[in-house]
């Protein structure tokens, strides 16, 4: 199982200038992937900006949105943005897609909460068309690749989209026992869709190996509008033992990659996590 690390782009009032340095240190430490968390109505750094900054500060580490709230965007515009980030990174981006559930995230006229599932279904075809240079006025340079997509969400529709359009599934930042049914559903849907091989499975867990009190406050703030079943069960690893327990739990589930998401923007957290996980990276 690979070990990745998140960017602190959605830590409340993040020092945004730290993102490129965080990305460079993560690559130097040997992590497999840099991931972002996506929200609009929150005082953080948008995932597309964070991913672009990380792309410019690194050369080899993978990049992942985990997850970007795709229905909040006009489809063609998002497809162009994603193609651009993937291009400047040298083809290192994977687009992780979520559908969103908070009314305040949906601010673009015509892109409200209602109807977001149907919009996303249509937009997925738009992404493919844009990346393929379809039409008399292509929106992306020739040679743009089809950016691989992963999907988050536990609803049946999300799992079905993953099986039709994606390369794998991203679980929520909950205990392994709570996310296991969704991972199993993703694998089952993949087989039922007649897909070859197996879906890539990615798990998330928050961590804070420095200021645990601030980290807990940040997570409570971020999830204050989430359902209690989520807000009360978000995983926050604050000790080496908890990090190792999460690794063991997800290894047992057969997960391909576990990404530890920072709950603070303390740059030293990169080294602290690497000191624990280095033998597995």
Predicted regions, residues:
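Active-site-adjacent structural elements that line small-molecule/cofactor binding pockets in enzymes
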Residues: 1-281
């Amino acid at each position: 199982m690979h070990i990745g690390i998140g960017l602190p782009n959605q830590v409340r009032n993040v020092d945004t200038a730290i993102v490129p340095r965080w990305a460079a240190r993560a690559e130097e430490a040997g992590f497999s992937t840099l991931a972002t968390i996506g929200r609009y109505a929150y005082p953080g750094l948008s995932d597309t900006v964070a991913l672009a900054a990380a792309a410019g500060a690194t050369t080899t580490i993978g990049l992942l949105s985990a997850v970007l709230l795709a229905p909040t965007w006009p489809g063609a515009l998002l497809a162009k943005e994603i193609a651009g980030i993937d291009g400047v990174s040298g083809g290192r981006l994977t687009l992780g897609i979520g559908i969103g559930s908070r009314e305040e995230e949906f601010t673009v006229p015509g892109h409200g909460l209602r109807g977001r599932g149907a919009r996303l279904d249509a937009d997925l075809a738009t992404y493919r068309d844009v990346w393929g240079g379809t039409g008399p006025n292509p929106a992306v340079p020739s040679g743009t690749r089809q950016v691989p997509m992963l999907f988050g969400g536990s609803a049946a529709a999300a799992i079905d989209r993953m099986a039709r359009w994606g390369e794998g599934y991203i679980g929520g930042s909950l205990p392994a026992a709570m996310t296991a049914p969704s991972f199993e559903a993703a694998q089952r849907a993949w087989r039922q869709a007649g897909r070859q091989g197996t879906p890539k499975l990615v798990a998330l867990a928050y961590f804070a190996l420095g200021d645990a009190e601030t980290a807990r406050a940040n997570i409570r703030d971020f999830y204050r509008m989430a359902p209690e079943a989520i807000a009360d069960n978000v995983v926050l690893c604050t000790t080496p033992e908890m990090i190792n327990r999460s690794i063991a739990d997800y290894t047992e589930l057969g997960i391909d990659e576990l990404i530890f998401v920072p709950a603070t923007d303390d740059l030293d957290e990169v080294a602290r996590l690497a000191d624990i996980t280095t033998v597995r990276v």
